[in-house]
Amino acid sequence: MDEVFGLFPTPFMRAPATLNARLVEGLVQHFSALASSRNKASDSLLHTEMLHPADSPLFVEAATLITPKLVDMGALMFGERLDWSIKEMWVNLMDRGGLQTMHNHSNSFVSGVVYLTAMHPESQTVFMKPSGGAEFVFKNEHANIAPTPFNADRWTVPQTAPGDLVLFPSYLLHAVPVNQGERRITLSFNAIPDGLDSWGYKVKFGT
């Protein structure tokens, strides 16, 4: 019998209802007023400054709930349950018509998003396959193809609810299409382990 294997898959974690409704509402109320940095690509997208868990009791509570998920994600990526910490957090407010262009997150191993409001189905986060080098590209792409995990060049996060968390390797390219719904609010963050050990070649990280 023929078998097909997905070699070296990329982990992506979705953790429903990681933050409870009370905490979600508190984050929305407190940080909506602090988002004043306008996105370079969209006037309808505002961000807070980079924040740290210690900046607010709400962030401390959120980080306490998120960190065990980071440990689980790290075990998939590095094969060991390491000590993880959140480096920075920020809140994003996207009004109707706003968008976030394709990007990834530097100086980080795992990035995450907590959805704080209901999302329009067409405004879920989209992840893109890296384009590779500058060599010639050949594609078979038209109306009659059937997308599979092996030929697709993008993937959209399934419908989310307030309090849901997603985690992904920080190098993954992602974007948000034009928001067709009401105000879209998310909490984003970057995380690192305390260190890595490759047969005695150790490196330590600090927040």
Task: Give residue spans per PLM region.
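Catalytic core of non-heme Fe(II) oxygenases with the double-stranded beta-helix
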Residues: 95-165, 193-205
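Non-heme Fe(II)/2-oxoglutarate
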Residues: 1-81, 92, 204-207
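Helix-adjacent hinge/juxtasegments
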Residues: 76-87, 91-92, 98-105, 109
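Short conserved micro-motifs at the rims of enzyme active sites and ligand-binding pockets
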Residues: 26, 179, 198-201
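A structural signal for short, well-ordered beta-strand segments
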Residues: 89-91, 112-114, 187-191
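Short beta-strand His + acidic residue motifs that chelate non-heme Fe in jelly-roll/DSBH
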Residues: 100-103, 174-180
